[in-house]
Amino acid sequence: NGYAEAWFELGQLYYTGQLVRQDKSRALTYFEHGARGGSAQASHALGTIYAERAQSSADSLFMDEATPLSALAARYFLQAAQNGHIPSAYNMGHLYLCRDIPSKEHKSRYGVLPDDRNAREWFAAASSKLFLPAMMNYSAMLLEGRGAGDMDTREADLDEAQRVYTRVIHTGSRVAMGKSAQESMERMTETARRGLRLIEEQRESVKAKGSSRGGE
């Protein structure tokens, strides 16, 4: 794996043009060597490159041209995530997350079919490693009941959402960061506080419905 990471580092040098003349084609080759050797960072780099190219193709000419690129991006993000790369796990959640577009268009754009259950599982994996963007998406899915396998788990989902939102707030109060990151953290913290209020409102609603049934 040491050789694989060396390929990744070499690819980074050529991709960014640091210390050597920039050569993105050569960088891609080195990243591929690294990915084949098991470097999660190299796989993530390839996923990022192909995702950016897919987006560029989708924005410019024909949507179908982006399909193989988006599929490649998803493949490499999955490879990296399975090797423990946390941002790639978050990216997989983002790719699977259902949107208000047809499934065929979703697959063309993101390289996978929409699947909220898969999205939730990947967000949960990254959230467990305290990756803040994943924590926000995971708790939002829990709150909205998206990707749930069984309605009987609703109370457990709300408990989990409360736990994750609370951890986001505590993290924001402890971590020192620059101005831009601080502003982003403040927005996430405010969203988390709003999420906690919504959780309490949902619990009160469930209690009220239970009471009304009991009185019938």
Regions found by a protein language model. Name each.
Residues 1-3, 16-18, 37-39, 53, ...:
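Short helix-capping/linker turns of helical repeat alpha-solenoids
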Residues 9-16, 45-57, 91-103, 135-146, ...:
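Hydrophobic face of amphipathic alpha-helices that form TPR/SEL1-like repeat modules
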Residues 18-22, 36, 55-68, 82, ...:
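Short coil/turn and helix-start
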Residues 170-216:
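Terminal, low-structured helical/coil segments at or just beyond the last alpha-helical repeat
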Residues 155-175:
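TPR/TPR-like (Sel1-like) alpha-helical repeat modules
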